[in-house]
From Swiss-Prot:
Keywords: Cell membrane, Lipoprotein, Membrane, Palmitate, Phosphate transport, Secreted, Signal, Transport. It comes from the Bacteria. The gene is pstS1. One of its GO terms (molecular function) is phosphate ion binding. Residues 1-23 form the signal peptide. This is Phosphate-binding protein PstS1. Belongs to the PstS family. A lipid is attached at residue 24 (S-diacylglycerol cysteine).
Length: 374
């Protein structure tokens, strides 16, 4: 397997890496005793002074931050939250460099990444999923696809949609002879991290050996293959390209449907084919709550649940536990705590097709949030 997160972070070592106290994660926290910031309890209200928190990263998580930011500002007018959808890779890099307070990511930092860059943390915010879409006019069925077949499509060994391997999964469906056009992310992406993990798990002797998985991978040079930036670019690119197959974050489900893209049923480890709905995502996630470690670095791809959708993940805030001042640390704590409590209500999550964190994972996230200080 090939993971590029460590490479991404290693590039940053040539520049000032973290926030002011980078590398000092073992120092006793120095948060405000009035709020408990950094003192083992979570600040539930922000500082009273004006504070701006900057977020960038995952385009999958971006729609949710666009709901959270204004809602938190309405409750606390002195707090402004800026959000940008730049891709998980950029979010991780900018959080590490200290240019943003929150790097939004669909991909977790490994234990090795965190050990090499003291102070960076994975903080789970919600549960998400990834859909596989396609542009096949005239095909109304939800086609069944699995990781092995998708790997062959992205490697160029399955060249047309009426290939016997696709037909075998979809008996009775009139498949066109349209050329397969694999579409991948051009930017460093947590969506690529998730999708290529799925291919690697279901095709371990093929895709799993090369190119493997990561936020960026060396996609095979398939004639006609295309690359796009962001989930919005993936929706547009696929909608404009007959024969396209694409992996797109669940928060863009409505946009993909509005553009007429088909949505695949994906094969899981039990051989069952499912769409990414609330039931299949929650079924897949249920078995992972008790397995989630304190640092929250865990893959939930292609889990064991027979009725579970195979591409699900925690959405993460990649955060440095040392912020520039006490007001920023307190406000960041308060916002992240709000995000995993009030912000996990259906009124927010349903709009992005996300699922709430289980109570046990909320406790893990809160324990990490409590370590943020100045």
């Amino acid at each position: 397997m090939k993971i590029r997160l460590h490479t991404l972070l290693a590039v940053l070592t040539a520049a000032p890496l973290l926030l002011a106290a980078a590398g000092c994660g073992s120092k006793p926290p120095s948060g405000s005793p009035e709020t408990g910031a950094g003192a083992g309890t979570v600040a539930t209200t922000p500082a009273s002074s004006p504070v701006t928190l900057a977020e960038t990263g995952s385009t999958l998580l971006y729609p949710l931050f666009n709901l959270w930011g204004p809602a938190f500002h309405e409750r606390y007018p002195n707090v402004t939250i800026t959000a940008q959808g730049t891709g998980s890779g950029a979010g991780i890099a900018q959080a590490a460099a200290g240019t943003v307070n929150i790097g939004a990511s669909d991909a977790y930092l490994s234990e090795g990444d965190m050990a090499a860059h003291k102070g960076l943390m994975n903080i789970a915010l919600a549960i998400s999923a990834q859909q596989v879409n396609y542009n096949l006019p005239g095909v109304s069925e939800h086609l069944k696809l699995n990781g092995k077949v998708l790997a062959a499509m992205y490697q160029g060994t399955i060249k047309t949609w009426d290939d016997p391997q696709i037909a075998a999964l979809n008996p009775g469906v009139n498949l066109p002879g349209t050329a397969v056009v694999p579409l991948h992310r051009s930017d460093g992406s947590g969506d690529t991290f998730l999708f290529t993990q799925y291919l690697s798990k279901q095709d371990p002797e093929g895709w799993g050996k090369s190119p493997g998985f990561g936020t960026t991978v060396d996609f095979p040079a398939v004639p006609g293959a295309l690359g796009e930036n962001g989930n919005g670019g993936m929706v547009t690119g696929c909608a404009e390209t007959p024969g396209c197959v694409a992996y797109i974050g669940i928060s863009f489900l409505d946009q993909a449907s509005q553009r007429g893209l088909g949505e695949a049923q994906l094969g899981n480890s039990s051989g069952n084919f499912l769409l990414p709905d609330a039931q299949s995502i929650q079924a897949a996630a249920a078995g992972f709550a008790s397995k989630t470690p304190a640092n929250q670095a865990i893959s939930m791809i292609d889990g064991p649940a027979p009725d579970g959708y195979p591409i699900i993940n925690y959405e993460y805030a990649i955060v440095n536990n040392r912020q520039k001042d006490a007001a920023t640390a307190q406000t960041l704590q308060a916002f992240l705590h709000w995000a995993i409590t009030d912000g996990n209500k259906a009124s927010f999550l349903d709009q992005a097709h996300f699922q709430p964190l289980p109570p046990a994972v909320v406790k893990l996230s809160d324990a990490l949030i409590a370590t943020i200080s100045s």
